[in-house]
Amino acid sequence: MAGTLDLDKGCTVEELLRGCIEAFDDSGKVRDPQLVRMFLMMHPWYIPSSQLAAKLLHIYQQSRKDNSSSLQVKTCHLVRYWISAFPAEFDLNPELAEQIKELKALLDQEGNRRHSSLIDIENVPTYKWKRQVTQRNPVEQKKRKMSLLFDHLEPLELAAHLTYLEYRSFCKILFQDYHSFVTHGCTVDNPVLERFISLFNSVSQWVQLMILSKPTAPQRAGVITHFVHVAEELLHLQNFNTLMAVVGGLSHSSISRLKETHSHVSPETIKLWEGLTELVTATGNYGNYRRRLAACVGFRFPILGVHLKDLVALQLALPDWLDPARTRLNGAKMKQLFSILEELAMVTSLRPPVQANPDLLSLLMVSLDQYQTEDELYQLSLQREPRSKSSPTSPTTCTPPPRPPVLEEWTSAAKPKLDQAIMVEHIEKMVESVFRNFDVDGDGHISQEEFQIIRGNFPYLSAFGDLDQNQDGCISKEEMVSYFLRSSSMLGGRMGFVHNFHESNSLRPVACRHCKALILGIYKQGLKCRACGVNCHKQCKDRLSVECRRRAQSMSLEGSAPSPSPTHTHHRAFSFSLPRPGRRGSRPPEIREEEVQTVEDGVFDIHL
């Protein structure tokens, strides 16, 4: 740091600005780059960038009166450094850009071409894409044709695509997003950070749903094993953020309670799982993770939630200013904040060592917006292994690792609602990918045979005839796009999970799945779902939170569907497979384990 400044004792903004100017020599060489970069990155924490630009303009004008040519050129070197190091500020802040243009115009009027040439504000690239909630960047096609069936993806391939998706989303986060989160304590008016958080949550939920989508314990154990190896590959890629999401999904209560499932997981996998869980545990303020991160070389993706907690803790523990008049900023706090934010900023300077398949990304981007509540996940877990089921007698006595502490205040953020135009764009790209990979004969239409192949990725698609609107025996791109748009809007983002109720008589009392009270009488006082058999009172239909769990089978989208519960916020989603539960008995609290089905079991999707 500059010798004349003692940041630990505090200093004014003007003193720190002067110290940054004096850090340059007349040739533009900076003697204290850490001080300069820290102040230019951190100044919005204390004053708006427009005020800083005004101070620089004032210093330059004052140096002209004092005939201090050295101060003039040093000021211009600082402005050049600012534009070079943080160009997004100038593209996204028109007021700031205009002030710098004003300084450049002043230099031109004076005929000072040498100083003016140092300030290149006209060629700042656009960064408006950083403010868009979703953005698809072109990526190189892989030479070999990658399978679009999620079950066919090797752990490394899946880890690479997860890394690519999260990295692309992370690169849009700017300093102002971190500052807003720390000052507000939440993601209010912060859609970019909120979207990244929802992606983290989506990965965690997707892991749970992929496990719970399998009807038998050995199959679920196989999915757990697969995701443990995905987590291992994420560690090799030094992607700790997605590693935390995957481990969190594996250790969630809806999965950890599946005792029979865990009895089929090998001891070797359990040992690996325990090691990965221990790495991201909160013990010792995430000491294991911090040590591993510090030892990383090259690309690394830190756990954003951990570092956001650090920022919030600093904000609460230390004041921004050391005096009531707010003239002397807290330099010690600034240095600590900078060390955290600089670590996060380094992520965007190094690209991950992965390549992504555009078609697979399009499918994943659509499936990402599936949303399930904690209660819905737990209900599905109870369907798989009801509470009353006795523990299995098995030679394998493996138990799942304890669930790592969850960053509740961070991961519980609601999913931001995408606008219609963005949703249409994703659906169209997804449909293009489907036709490019599954239209075998290349005639621009999907035949019934090709449709059955597609169901490997979209098991909750309705019957072929529901998509074939003109009934010509094949499905066009327009018909498939129309189907997804219609389904998403009509079902409130819950495709494949909506009950198909009809009035039902019962010769004996049955319990309402919502209120648990008996449905009495034989005069059609109750409703029953044709697909899954769930019963409820007519007045309870709209409040029923249990979703229809029948497997992909013909069910018209025009059938009756309950209105979404006012207590739940539904977000758009697209249909993906969950296996069908077995027929319920007369005793409602429990659901018998379904029989193994010979039809396709569905593929990963639900929630990447």
From Swiss-Prot:
- Could you tell me where this protein is found in the cell? Cytoplasm, Cytosol; Cell membrane; Synapse, Synaptosome; Cell projection, Ruffle membrane
Q: Which SUPFAM superfamilies match?
A: Cysteine-rich domain (SSF57889), EF-hand (SSF47473), Ras GEF (SSF48366)
Q: Where are the zinc-finger regions (Phorbol-ester/DAG-type) in this chain?
A: 498-548
| Cellular component terms (Gene Ontology) | cytosol; neuron projection; plasma membrane; ruffle membrane; synapse
- List every stretch annotated Disordered: 382-407, 556-591
Q: Where does Ca(2+) 1 bind?
A: D439, D441, D443, H445, E450
Q: From the record, what ranges are coiled-coil?
A: none
Which residues are noted in the entry as Ca(2+) 2-binding? D468, N470, D472, C474, E479
The EF-hand domain covers 426-461, 463-490
Q: Which UniProt keywords apply?
A: Calcium, Cell membrane, Cell projection, Cytoplasm, Guanine-nucleotide releasing factor, Membrane, Metal-binding, Phosphoprotein, Repeat, Synapse, Synaptosome, Zinc, Zinc-finger
The protein's topology relative to the membrane is: Peripheral membrane protein
For this chain, one GO molecular function annotation is: calcium ion binding
Superkingdom, according to UniProt? Eukaryota
Among CDD domains, the record links this protein to:
C1_RASGRP2, EFh, RasGEF, REM
Phosphoserine modified-residue sites: S116, S117, S147, S554, S575
Q: Taking the first listed entry, what is the main subcellular location of this protein, grouped into a coarse class?
A: cytoplasm
Q: Which InterPro entries match?
A: C1-like_sf, EF-hand-dom_pair, EF_Hand_1_Ca_BS, EF_hand_dom, PE/DAG-bd, Ras-like_GEF, Ras-like_Gua-exchang_fac_N, Ras_GEF_dom_sf
Q: Which residues form the Ras-GEF domain?
A: 154-387
Biological role: Functions as a calcium- and DAG-regulated nucleotide exchange factor specifically activating Rap through the exchange of bound GDP for GTP. May also activate other GTPases such as RRAS, RRAS2, NRAS, KRAS but not HRAS. Functions in aggregation of platelets and adhesion of T-lymphocytes and neutrophils probably through inside-out integrin activation. May function in the muscarinic acetylcholine receptor M1/CHRM1 signaling pathway.
Stated family: Belongs to the RASGRP family.
Self-association or partners: how does it assemble? Forms a signaling complex with RAP1 and BRAF. Interacts with RAP1. Interacts with F-actin.
The disease tied to this protein in UniProt is:
Defects in RASGRP2 may be the cause of Simmental thrombopathia. An inherited platelet disorder first described in Simmental cattle and characterized by mild to severe bleeding episodes.
Recorded domain comment: The N-terminal Ras-GEF domain mediates association with F-actin.
Q: What's the name of the protein?
A: RAS guanyl-releasing protein 2
